[in-house]
C-alpha cells in the first residue's frame, strides 16, 4: 500500500514499454551509480558514497589486493586490502561489491516478476537483458564470495534465500547464459545502442567463468574457455586501433572504440555521474 496517493504500486508503475525500459535502467544503474539522485549520497549503508560504487570497488578488490595497484590514501579499507590484513570492521570494498551485486539480483528479480504476465512487443528483449545482468552479478558474487544467497523471482517476499554452493551456482549461471545465447530474445552484437548488453556479453562471461572453473567446481574447463573466447571474437569484436580512444567521453559514438567493448558500464557528464568508474582512476 503506497504511503500517499501520488506513489505508484507495482501494478501502476508498469503499463507501457517505456515504463519497463525505465525499470531495466534501474537495474543497469546499480552497476554505476551511488544512488538515483545524488552521487554524493549512497543508497546503501556506507560512510562515503563514492566508496559504494560497484565498478570502483570491484576494481579495487581485484587489483589493490595484489601488486597490480597501489594507493597512498589513508582510508582503512585501502590499508587492509594492500596488506591483506583484516579487522572486525566491515571492509568498505567487500561490503560495497557484495551489497551492490545483491542489489542487482533483487532489482532484476522484481523486474522479472512484474513483467512475467505482460505481452508487450519488445518486452522479451528487456527481460533477457535483466536475466543477463542478474547472471553477471551472480558471477561476481560466486567469484569473489563463493557461496552467496541464491534468490529468484519466484522466491516469496520476506523469506530468507538459501545457499546452493559454489559449484551449483556455477552450473546455474552457465545454464542461464547458454539459454540466453541459444534464444532469440537477447540482442545480437550491434543490434542495440551502446551500452546495452548483447549475446557477446553472455559469451564472454562464459569464457571468463571457464578460465577459473577448476576453482569454482573442481574441474578444469580449458578447452571450453578457448572455445567461448573464440566464439566471442567471431561475433565481430576487434581491438581499437588507438588505445587512448577507449577512455574518451564519446564511446557511444566512436565506432573504433565500440568494436572493442563487449560489456560496458556507462558514465556521462549529465545523467550517470558518480565517484567511481574512470573518475576514481584519475583522481
Q: Can you say where each PLM-predicted feature lies in the sequence?
A:
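Amphipathic alpha-helical segments of tetratricopeptide repeats
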Residues: 182, 233-234
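Flexible helix-coil transition and linker loops at the boundaries of alpha-helical arrays
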Residues: 114-124, 183-194
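Short coil/turn connectors between adjacent alpha-helices in alpha-solenoid helical repeat scaffolds
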Residues: 97-100, 163-167, 214-224
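Amphipathic alpha-helical protein-interaction segments enriched in hydrophobic
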Residues: 194-205
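Short acidic-aromatic linear motifs embedded in glycine-rich loops, typified by GG[WY][YF]DAGD(H)
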Residues: 1-129, 133, 138-144, 148-154, ...
Amino acid at each position: 500500500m503506497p504511503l500517499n496517493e501520488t506513489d505508484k504500486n507495482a501494478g501502476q508503475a508498469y503499463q507501457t514499454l517505456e515504463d519497463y525500459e525505465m525499470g531495466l535502467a534501474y537495474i543497469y544503474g546499480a552497476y554505476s551509480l551511488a544512488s538515483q539522485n545524488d552521487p554524493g549520497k549512497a543508497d546503501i549503508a556506507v560512510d562515503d558514497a563514492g566508496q559504494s560504487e560497484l565498478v570502483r570497488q570491484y576494481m579495487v578488490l581485484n587489483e589493490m589486493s595484489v601488486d597490480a595497484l597501489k594507493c597512498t590514501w589513508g582510508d582503512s579499507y585501502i590499508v587492509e586490502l594492500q596488506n591483506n590484513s583484516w579487522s572486525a570492521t566491515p571492509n568498505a570494498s567487500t561490503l560495497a561489491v557484495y551489497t551492490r551485486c545483491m542489489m542487482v539480483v533483487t532489482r532484476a528479480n522484481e523486474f522479472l516478476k512484474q513483467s512475467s504476465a505482460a505481452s508487450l512487443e519488445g518486452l522479451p528483449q528487456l527481460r533477457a537483458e535483466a536475466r543477463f545482468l542478474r547472471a553477471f552479478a551472480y558471477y561476481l558474487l560466486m567469484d569473489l564470495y563463493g557461496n552467496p544467497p541464491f534468490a529468484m523471482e519466484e522466491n516469496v517476499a520476506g523469506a530468507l534465500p538459501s545457499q546452493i554452493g559454489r559449484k551449483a551456482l556455477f552450473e546455474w549461471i552457465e545454464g542461464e547464459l547458454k539459454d540466453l545465447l541459444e534464444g532469440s530474445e537477447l540482442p545480437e552484437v550491434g543490434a542495440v545502442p551502446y551500452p546495452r548488453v548483447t549475446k557477446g556479453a553472455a559469451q564472454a562471461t562464459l569464457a571468463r567463468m571457464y578460465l577459473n572453473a577448476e576453482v569454482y567446481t573442481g574441474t578444469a574447463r580449458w578447452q571450453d574457455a578457448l572455445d567461448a573466447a573464440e566464439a566471442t571474437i567471431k561475433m565481430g569484436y576487434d581491438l581499437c586501433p588507438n588505445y587512448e580512444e577507449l577512455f574518451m567521453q564519446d564511446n557511444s559514438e566512436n565506432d573504433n572504440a565500440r568494436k572493442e567493448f563487449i560489456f560496458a558500464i556507462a558514465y556521462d557528464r549529465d545523467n550517470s555521474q558518480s565517484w567511481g568508474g574512470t573518475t576514481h582512476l584519475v583522481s
